Amino acid sequence: MSGDARKTAEGLAYLSGFGNEHASEAVAGALPEGRNSPQRAPLGLYAEQLSGTAFTEPRAHNRRSWLYRIRPSAAHPAFTRSGNGTIRTAPFNQAVPDPNRLRWNPLPVPGPATDFVEGLWTLGGNGDATQRTGMAVHLYHATASMDRVFSDADGELLIVPERGGLLLRTEFGLLHAEPGHVALIPRGVRFRVQLLDEDARGYVCENYGAPFQLPDLGPIGANGLANARDFRAPVAAYEDDESTPGPVEVVNKFCGNLWTAEYDHSPLDVVAWHGNHVPYVYDLRRFNVIGSISYDHPDPSIFTVLTSPSDTPGLAGVDFVVFAPRWLVGEDTFRPPYFHRNVMSEYMGLIEGAYDAKAEGFVPGGGSLHNMMSAHGPDRETFDRASAAELKPQRIDDGLAFMFETRWPVTLTPQAARAEHLQPGYDDVWQGLERHFRPLH
């Protein structure tokens, strides 16, 4: 929460481009030339590969990075089990999947020394982390920066801040994420979260499946939606235990459980690296929104930022979708999102402002769940207003909402099903939608 941390965050340099083969060194000469693993790595460093995909996956989908570090990752004592807190992992078999429409207020304020890991609270998910399928929806509310270091062997983490800035110290370098940004931490990458404000709150999609990638654009063409160049990767920065002595607690999430070990050095000691299995930060306001300039509301797939493909083409394990500022100009068109029943399951969150399909009740930091084939759509107030509105060009710029959309039903954790901040009577927003049918004869 110090001014120095914010100054550091706001002055960071980045590398540009999602999926690029990046290279960075914090000390000149730390990267070897012409090979990955020389007999003696430069500057007395250790060469180590971090693989995010199998060696033999197609080159277009292969993810790996080479790290040149002060000590190898293997130099640590045994891990021991620790408590999982409010973190839960698929398979979610402690509850029956619920077809009801559900909505939550923001998480309650936690205690004064709650860091990012302790502040993670699992709402639900699907699949099986041990089979590398499915996803989980988490929320977080933290009041303290992390002293320890965290990594997730179960999946990659898409962090969506809603309140409070974050300085993410990763093995690859530093990332700055504010509300309106997202940060993507690949599977297995170690990191520490430092708060830039009094507290921090937001959402996390834990993706157990194939790594997130940019969606295909099809007839849209070569440009549009989330442009690859707007994803920013860190430049190399390292911690050296000679300047930061003392043990470091490392927390590893593995097959749904948290394990801890006490290192005698910081694992964030990578002096140089190259590869494409790297963390990113992305400003959602740079999303190039595609929409109709004639009539009708297009399907929400046009708002896809990132997708985790499944074994069925076009059917995602999970999509990350953003409803960014945009113009609505459709003629003779009901402009809010239409009434819908969907084979996919949708968890929605709100980063700021209001969502154009809900007049009230859907608040920043809260969320809603519409499982597969659960009917949903605009509430009565929104329907009445949009049905009678003058159809002049309308700018939607007072809200930033997002969606985690997944092919499987989202099963709630018991803590989410019984939460005090679960809103009662969410179904009431669709009550009072009157009969308007008048037969011609």
From Swiss-Prot:
Specify which residues bind Fe cation according to the UniProt entry for this protein: H340, E346, H376
InterPro entries, A to Z: HgmA_C, HgmA_N, Homogentis_dOase, Homogentis_dOase_bac, RmlC-like_jellyroll, RmlC_Cupin_sf
Binding of homogentisate occurs at Y355, H376
What biological-process terms (Gene Ontology) are attached?
A: L-phenylalanine catabolic process; tyrosine catabolic process
The EC class name is oxidoreductase
Catalytic residue positions: H297 (proton acceptor)
The pathway where this protein functions is:
Amino-acid degradation; L-phenylalanine degradation; acetoacetate and fumarate from L-phenylalanine: step 4/6
Which family would the database say this protein is a member of? Belongs to the homogentisate dioxygenase family.
Subunit info here reads: Hexamer; dimer of trimers.
| The name this protein goes by in its record | Homogentisate 1,2-dioxygenase
Ranked from the top, the taxonomy reads: Bacteria, Bacillati, Actinomycetota, Actinomycetes, Kitasatosporales
